[in-house]
C-alpha cells in the first residue's frame, strides 16, 4: 500500500462493497463476490482526499467457505460415506449401460465410488489435462486477447476440437508430440489409467474404510482413455492448487502456480455444455468439463456451496448410444453429494 494511504474502498460492479481504514502497511480485506463475472475497483485515498484506483476483471466469485487455503487436506481416497455409497451404488447399478462414478467432499474426505477404475473412452474430458500442461509450460497465464488465450477459451468453454489440436501442436510440435507431453504430465501426477492417444478427430460407521475403487465392468474400445478416479484426482488437484496446495503445486514447483489454477477454474465456470452436472446449478456453483461421443457421455467437475467443495465425476457408456439418461445420472450423483455436505 502506498505511503500516506488512509482508506481503501472496494467497489464491485460500481457498488461500494467494503471500506478499510489503513493503520498498517499490510492487511486483509475480505469481500464476498457473486457467482458471476464482476469488475472490481480498488481505490486508495490519502489524507488530502486524492484517489488512486486499480480495476480488476472479470472476476468470478466462489463461496469463501469452499476455499482450499487452510486446514488439513483429506487423504486422497478419503473415507467411504456409507449413506452416500448406498445411493451411488444404486444409481450405478440402475444405469442402462456401463458407468464409472466418483464423488468426494473435498473438506471432509467423505465420498463414494462405483466402478471408478474402469477405463472409458475419454472424449473431451482430457482437454483439462491439455490446459494444465500448457500453463505449466508457459509458466503463467496467456495474455488477454492473445491467440493462446482464445484457443484455451474455445477448448474449455465450447469444447472445440480444433483448438485442442492446435494447443497440442504448441506443446509438442504435433498432436502426437503434444499428446506425449500431456501423458507424461499425467503420469507425474499418478494418473496412470488415462491416455491422450494423439489429437482429436475433426468432425462437424466408527471404522472408516477407504472409498472403494473396484471394477465392475468396462467397455471395449481403442483410443483416448480415462477413469473416474483419474479425472476426479485431476479436478481435486486443480482445486487445491488454487490455494497453493496439492499435487500440481508440489510436483511442478514454480512451473504451475495458484494463478494458473484460478485461471483454468474461471474457464471451467463458463463451460457452455448442457446437461450433466449443470443439473446441480441452483444448489451449487458448477465448474466442469464434459465430453461425449456416440457411445460415451461424461462430465467431471467441482461443485461449490457456501459450506464446502465437492468433486463429482460421472462416466457413462452404452454400445447402443447414450443420451439424456447419462445427463440425468450425473445430476442425481451431484445432488446426492450435495445433500450429504
Where are these regions (language model features)?
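Structured C-terminal helix/loop/strand segments within mature extracytoplasmic catalytic/sensor domains
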Residues: 2-3, 12, 29-47, 54-67, ...
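Short beta-strand segments within Ig-like beta-sandwich modules, predominantly Fibronectin type-III
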Residues: 16-25
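Second-shell loop/turn segments in exported
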Residues: 70-78, 113-121, 140-142, 150-154, ...
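Short, conserved catalytic-motif segment at the N-terminal edge
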Residues: 92-119
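Active-site SXXK
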Residues: 109, 119-143, 155, 312
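Active-site-proximal loop and beta-strand segments within enzyme catalytic domains
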Residues: 136-162, 176, 180, 188
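Mid-domain, small-residue-enriched loop/turn segments at the edges of structured enzyme/sensor domains
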Residues: 168-247
Amino acid at each position: 500500500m502506498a505511503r500516506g494511504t488512509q482508506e481503501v474502498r472496494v467497489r464491485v460492479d460500481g457498488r461500494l462493497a467494503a471500506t478499510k481504514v489503513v493503520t498498517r502497511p499490510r492487511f486483509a480485506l475480505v469481500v464476498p463476490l457473486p457467482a458471476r463475472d464482476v469488475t472490481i475497483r480498488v481505490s486508495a485515498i490519502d489524507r488530502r482526499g486524492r484517489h488512486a484506483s486499480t480495476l480488476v476483471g472479470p472476476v468470478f466469485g466462489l463461496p469463501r467457505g469452499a476455499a482450499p487455503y487452510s486446514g488439513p487436506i483429506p487423504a486422497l481416497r478419503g473415507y467411504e460415506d456409507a449413506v452416500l455409497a448406498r445411493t451411488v451404488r444404486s444409481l450405478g447399478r440402475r444405469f442402462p449401460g456401463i458407468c464409472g462414478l466418483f464423488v468426494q467432499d473435498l473438506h471432509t474426505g467423505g465420498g463414494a465410488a462405483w466402478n471408478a477404475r474402469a477405463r472409458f473412452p475419454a472424449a473431451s474430458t482430457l482437454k483439462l489435462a491439455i490446459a494444465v500442461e500448457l500453463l505449466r509450460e508457459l509458466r503463467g497465464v496467456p495474455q488477454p486477447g492473445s491467440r493462446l488465450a482464445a484457443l484455451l477459451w474455445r477448448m474449455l468453454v465450447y469444447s472445440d476440437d480444433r483448438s485442442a489440436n492446435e494447443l497440442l501442436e504448441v506443446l509438442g510440435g504435433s498432436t502426437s508430440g503434444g499428446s506425449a507431453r500431456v501423458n507424461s504430465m499425467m503420469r507425474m501426477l499418478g494418473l496412470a489409467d488415462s491416455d491422450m492417444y494423439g489429437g482429436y478427430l475433426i468432425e462437424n460407521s466408527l471404522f472408516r474404510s477407504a472409498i472403494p475403487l473396484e471394477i465392475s465392468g468396462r467397455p471395449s474400445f481403442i483410443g483416448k482413455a480415462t477413469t473416474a478416479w483419474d479425472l476426479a484426482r485431476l479436478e481435486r488437484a486443480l482445486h487445491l492448487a488454487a490455494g497453493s496446495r496439492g499435487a500440481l503445486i508440489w510436483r511442478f514447483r514454480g512451473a504451475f502456480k495458484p494463478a494458473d489454477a484460478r485461471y483454468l477454474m474461471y474457464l471451467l465456470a463458463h463451460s457452455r455444455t448442457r446437461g450433466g452436472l449443470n443439473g446441480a446449478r441452483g444448489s451449487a456453483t458448477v465448474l466442469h468439463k464434459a465430453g461425449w461421443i456416440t457411445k460415451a457421455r461424461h462430465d467431471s467437475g467441482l461443485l461449490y456451496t457456501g459450506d464446502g467443495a465437492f468433486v463429482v465425476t460421472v462416466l457413462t457408456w452404452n454400445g447402443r448410444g447414450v443420451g439424456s439418461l447419462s445427463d440425468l445420472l450425473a445430476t442425481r450423483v451431484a445432488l446426492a453429494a450435495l445433500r450429504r455436505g
